[in-house]
């Protein structure tokens, strides 16, 4: 092992030990499942903002997004980033405060499925169980992609066996999440967002300098047809510019719709201690997201120029997702300090993965232990039993995710894209209508959830392959169909009870 690799290893080990320590400290504050899954609703504004965005921006921020920009230019990555930035702001603006109030009013709901059940007085728990099933369906492979990303990182850096690296990474994530629950996940996510920011800044500065300056970056990138255009895309196969139609732009920007249905992000809104500070959280979150997304896309362009001038090898296919890893390896060759900085960058990649994986594990765990098992558990007063069930469920889900992640060849961006569409379509419309349309009833919510979730599969595997006008991101049509289903079914079935309507009015009138 070289001195540079040793420095990188030291930085990463210090980071990992810190995460486990936080989990241990937070474990002492968990006295109930409310604490374990929602931190007792005690998050401050900065932790709420940064943990929400860190859990949102998974490894694709430092791997997938720069990789797409490196290969095809700024159009695909750019419109995705714009959709996400707009979606982030709107989610904080219209959903955050209302869902914080409503979940607290609705029998102190601590999960999204339990909120649906309490919101519509669903005594048979149909909404709760079906929502929980969708969470497990989409989150287990999503978590597996995070484990796989960690394994790939260590394997490529140190030449260790992929499976060994993946399992060790999974153990660390599971350790602090199982110990500390939501509070540990949120605290570590806050720290991880800072590390991710440092990683982006260092790579940006070093990359521009190595590429020969901003002018050289723009000059080299502009030589590729359509590479720097928002209405064209560079086609790797033909070497020519390909049209980026208005339909494709709308389809790509539709990523922003996914935010309304992301359980691990919505939980942060539910957990803030003082709803009056959500405005501050919104500003912090939006600024961080806009800057991070812009820098991530630009790093992809910088990486191409670095390859063009011979500083890096030319990357093809999924290897383009390792562009920041390659830049870090180059940085580490400039001495001990730079090697430690490279370690921080790589810890940032690790952080981007871990910050999402821990939140996903908690959401999937709560879906099984609290929403599925809890729906059939008669005695809910046994706090120790509930906590034990929560931790055991988290461990079982982690083992399943690790089993799926044993294959190192899966695409991080593709898995994230599909899971994002699944949650956005299954839950997004139901969340919005539950919060803002009084006439919505449980049958409409159920129809929207089932239609949205199932249409993601139907569109992706049966309709989208037809090409042409059908080749759009599955989230957009599935989201719209779910909205239509909610309205039609709600209007065709009895309206909500007077008690439900009065509760809706009470929440809506809160100042």
Where are the language model's segments positioned?
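Membrane-embedded helix-loop-helix hairpins and adjacent transmembrane boundary segments
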Residues: 1-511
